Amino acid sequence: MSADSQSIAATENEEKSHEVPGNVQHCGDMLSGQEETVPLGTSQESTHIKAEPEEPHSEGASREDRTPGTQRWMSPCPGPKDKGPFLPGGVVPSPWTPVLSRGGRTRERKMAAALLTAWSQMPVTFEDVALYLSQEEWGRLDHTQQNFYRDVLQGKNGLALGAVEMGKVVPALAVATLEDTKSIRTRARWAPGEDPKCGQHVASGPGTKLTRDTGKAGQLKPAPSESRPLKTPEDSGPEKPSEGEEALKSGEEGLVPDGDTGKKTYKCEQCGKGFSWHSHLVTHRRTHTGEKPYTCTDCGKRFGRSSHLIQHQIIHTGEKPYTCPSCWKSFSHHSTLIQHQRIHTGEKPYVCDRCAKRFTRRSDLVTHQGTHTGAKPHKCPICSKCFTQSSALVTHQRTHTGVKPYPCPECGKCFSQRSNLIAHNRTHTGEKPYHCLDCGKSFSHSSHLTAHQRTHRGVRPYSCPLCGKSFSRRSNLHRHEKIHTTGPKALAMLMLGAAAAGALTAPPPAST
């Protein structure tokens, strides 16, 4: 066997031994050299191979090292005077990258190219396709160029990962996958100009990652191999969609929200109402259970929905961001503004299905429908009085407790209902928003306008039960009733009534 054949065989055996994961080398020897090296990104012999200065070899060097005109091209570690490769971002490169010199023999250069061709068909990790720069080259780059190479390294801007030489991006041997790109940050990293201390050991080899050992400071440990087959830009076809993408396309249950498909798969067990979202069902169930988990920190009032609590808290802040463009009146809620604007437009969108009466508010329609059904489900526990709405019951209960939570900011007078406070404020401002269409007279209260309009129509709905006299206002009836109960006139009428009753019931006089 010739000397060249023996050299090739020895080199192949050495390469196989280097492929075994877990080969431990001193990191100080790996990164402290002075020789500038760049890995070959392709299997071809190209102009990207850098020349290396020749050094005298020691007598104990291997046969490959003693070969004239060559340098170590499958060396596991650079020599102590070599300058190791530097990877932007501080990632430690793989030490098994072939390095050639221009002075090598043609036969050995061809053999290296053949080995690279075989090596390109093996599963590799991210280190095999990473960007390699020497520390000196990295230091010559300005801040913009360094950021650009970092972007290329992380797969940004659609660029494939490749080898970098003297500021030029070389097409990569393989395109790193997303998992490989993300795993960069899990490897051991050193900042530019920072070298690991001597005595630290690095597990190297194909399929090996480097991670910091949190158990011992300054130590590194190998991570599980996550090598993947190579993908070249020419051979790579359309990628197979992931399981999540296939599930989204097929509409697999649990990955596609029912709200997107229009289905109402969540049913209420009590009333059978359907919902597209489970959260909506949970909120709806509180209407049956009466649960109110959201509490106002200012007044202690509780709500079943967080949105209702947020709307309520505006009352305490006094904020009124919604203004009517017609009368410039401000409101704390947008829905209240919409209801107010119907006063100007005359719109009454809510119609009773029994009598066709129209209303501007839904709550007014619900209250009106109680007159047809006679249902009053809300009962006062103190006086047993019933009401059609829960809000009416709450207002009524203040007559028992004496609570008046609405004070006037001008005079300090308190009221049990907000509507009474609003009407009272008009006595300070002099506002009279209610106008009679017949005579143009204005009023501060809507009830005053309603009573006034009866004078034009001649309607007198309030009648005295004792004498039958009718009145257009309830207050006039109450004033009239006092005539029957108090005063000299009432006493005379009682005497006349008693006399008349006695005359009718007195027995006939006895005959003589």
Swiss-Prot record:
Residues 1-5 form a propeptide. It comes from the Eukaryota. Residues 47-67, 228-252 have a biased composition (Basic and acidic residues). Residues 1-104, 187-261 are annotated as: Disordered. Induction: Repressed by heat. GO terms for biological process: negative regulation of transcription by RNA polymerase II; positive regulation of hydrogen peroxide biosynthetic process; positive regulation of mitochondrial outer membrane permeabilization involved in apoptotic signaling pathway. Residues 1-10 have a biased composition (Polar residues). SMART domains: KRAB, ZnF_C2H2. It is found in: Nucleus. A zinc finger (C2H2-type) spans 266-288, 294-316, 322-344, 350-372, 378-400, 406-428, 434-456, 462-484. Keywords: DNA-binding, Metal-binding, Nucleus, Repeat, Repressor, Transcription, Transcription regulation, Zinc, Zinc-finger. GO terms for cellular component: mitochondrion; nucleus. One of its GO terms (molecular function) is zinc ion binding. Pfam families: KRAB, zf-C2H2. Residues 124-196 form the KRAB domain. The KRAB domain is required for transcriptional repression. Transcriptional repressor that binds to the promoter region of Mpv17l isoform M-LP short and regulates its age-dependent and heat-induced expression. By regulating Mpv17l expression, contributes to the regulation of genes involved in H(2)O(2) metabolism and the mitochondrial apoptotic cascade. Belongs to the krueppel C2H2-type zinc-finger protein family. This is Transcriptional repressor Rhit. It comes from Mus musculus. The lineage of its organism: Eukaryota, Metazoa, Chordata, Craniata, Vertebrata. The gene is Zfp13.
